[in-house]
Amino acid sequence: MVYLEWAKADRNIQYRVINAIIKERIYPEQTFISQKGSLIEIQYHMHVLTIEVVRKSALERYEFTGDITYLNKGETSLIITLEGLLDVLNHDFDIPISERLREELIHSRDSLVETYKQMSHRQTLISQSFKFSRLPQDINFFSWLQHVKDSDKTDDLTYSESLVPEGHPTHPLTKTKLPLTMEEVRAYAPEFEKEIPLQIMMIEKDHVVCTAMDGNDQFIIDEIIPEYYNQIRVFLKSLGLKSEDYRAILVHPWQYDHTIGKYFEAWIAKKILIPTPFTILSKATLSFRTMSLIDKPYHVKLPVDAQATSAVRTVSTVTTVDGPKLSYALQNMLNQYPGFKVAMEPFGEYANVDKDRARQLACIIRQKPEIDGKGATVVSASLVNKNPIDQKVIVDSYLEWLNQGITKESITTFIERYAQALIPPLIAFIQNYGIALEAHMQNTVVNLGPHFDIQFLVRDLGGSRIDLETLQHRVSDIKITNDSLIADSIDAVIAKFQHAVIQNQMAELIHHFNQYDCVEETELFNIVQQVVAHAINPTLPHANELKDILFGPTITVKALLNMRMENKVKQYLNIELDNPIKKEV
């Protein structure tokens, strides 16, 4: 069993590397790529890699099967491992894979092995539990979720955060979490469902910068851990310190063990930063360093000095300021659409030191996403992953829960309702306020109810893009601290929407449904195109720019692997692909 999971994970990352090479054109000029029947060949001089294609979707998205074969000067062999593929690419195809990138890819594979083992283990436990419960063996995932939610055994959203074993759908570094060991991956990654104790530390008030929607610097003590108020006061008193001179901050246990001592040893010695014996329980969300506090109505975004996918996941000081400031300034605007909410960020803080160290000791408090509605609330990324209850892809389980089955009618209705609930509010934010929320599948929470009733909540204001001129026209006194939120032009704001919603949300769902013979991919993208066209208000600002970019002949896509090879994670490398919703404007 373990070998099967290893082989499945290894092949998965091999396929992602090949897909990225084709899509991002990561090869020398003399390389020829051709498709012969169901086979794709990558030829460079006397070297040929061949792989079988099951299907291809928009935006150069392939689904492969079988081993990759390698023809080297007339001799054929099979590529058995990721390491073997990387060696061939490096030595025979002149595609430079650095030692660091090799390490990242292998770590992604090894973490994916652990994930697959965990998903198999969960499936075994669940089928055993069905034998001892009165639930039918073939219960639908949504019926099961409602059962456990009603019995207070689990919270549907938190559970769904653990149901994205594939992580990022196309990134070869989907599971990279360097320098974590596999034991640490099992302790802290969301798919392992572990309770994670966050350390409570105290910072002397003149050495911390707090920003609160309500102006309360003691937000964490007063609102999040009031049960510790007396214990913290007594603990500080035992050190000869006064609690009113300190502010609480939450720290991820990995960061506490590996990073805090390295960067803040002098502060700890001077009692500027105080470790305490107190912790608060949490579970990891899909973003790994954003934690859902157990039995508390909050999430907390924390720095973890580790590389997850392409970037090191620290927290920039300016996002701790802008989250609460934007939440306060825009709270009425952000929640004016029925069926579409934005999670407020009431509090943020960071250590008042140089920026590089401050990124390591900071936090943002976010309201826990909650949507009132029947059915189930899940993170959108889970929709295209299998669940361990009925072993179906979650969006398919939803259609079956509606008694619709997988038919042309049910799929087209779902895509239409999903797009109608998600796209018009996001385009209205761009036209009215110059803001594009980063509403990709990891950042959106969806409530799927009966009768195709669909509602959304977007979390994480930190990835937004803002056209300051448009926003200041509506909210004149707003100040943005974080330069990375401010777009160079309205075009960059629209591109953020296009990447998060058209490329990620809609293209991922359509790629999944594209495997069924009853629907055509182009029909589903036509539905998206119509919803977008209808959402653009010709009497409001930026209507022409929205049409030109969203319906243009090409779509700009991040070159995720290439930017890792060039080490340009912050300066995005882009490629142009055919736009699946292009039309004459």
UniProtKB/Swiss-Prot annotation:
From the UniProt record, give one GO term of the biological process aspect.
siderophore biosynthetic process
EC annotation from Swiss-Prot or TrEMBL: 6.3.2.57
Q: Which UniProt keywords apply?
A: ATP-binding, Ligase, Nucleotide-binding
What is its pathway? Siderophore biosynthesis
Q: What is a single molecular function from GO for this protein?
A: ATP binding
> Reaction catalysed by this chain?
N(5)-[(S)-citryl]-D-ornithine + citrate + ATP = staphyloferrin A + AMP + diphosphate + H(+)
Its biological purpose: Involved in the biosynthesis of the siderophore staphyloferrin A. Catalyzes the ATP-dependent condensation of a citryl-D-ornithine intermediate, produced by SfnaD, and citrate to form staphyloferrin A.
Family statement drawn from the similarity comment of this UniProt entry: Belongs to the IucA/IucC family.
* Protein name in the entry: Staphyloferrin A synthase
Q: Which organism is it from?
A: Staphylococcus aureus (strain NCTC 8325 / PS 47)
Q: Which gene encodes it?
A: sfnaB
